Curated annotation (Swiss-Prot):
The keyword Disulfide bond applies. The lineage of its organism: Eukaryota, Metazoa, Ecdysozoa, Arthropoda, Chelicerata. InterPro entries: Defensin_invertebrate/fungal, Scorpion_toxin-like_sf. This is Defensin BmKDfsin3. GO terms for cellular component: extracellular region. Disulfide bonds join 28-49, 35-57, 39-59. Its main location: secreted. GO terms for biological process: defense response to bacterium; innate immune response. One of its GO terms (molecular function) is toxin activity. Residues 1-24 form the signal peptide. It comes from Olivierus martensii (Manchurian scorpion).
Length: 62
């Protein structure tokens, strides 16, 4: 039982550290407007945050 608890705690700590190191792109996930403006700046119609936990900026096709 102790082994399972220790493994669970280590997995939780590892996941927490990994989540903190993720670099979100172009304002995602907290500033979808920044993603939209980025997409407009590269001559797309706009964009939105998508993917796991909305970490990726996706631009609309023309």
């Amino acid at each position: 039982m102790k082994t399972i608890v220790i493994l669970f705690v280590l997995a939780l700590v590892f996941c927490t550290l990994e989540m903190g190191m993720v670099e979100a792109g172009f304002g995602c996930p907290f500033n979808q407007g920044k993603c939209h403006r980025h997409c407009r700046s590269i001559r797309r119609r706009g964009g939105y945050c998508d993917g796991f936990l909305k970490q990726r900026c996706v631009c609309y096709r023309k």
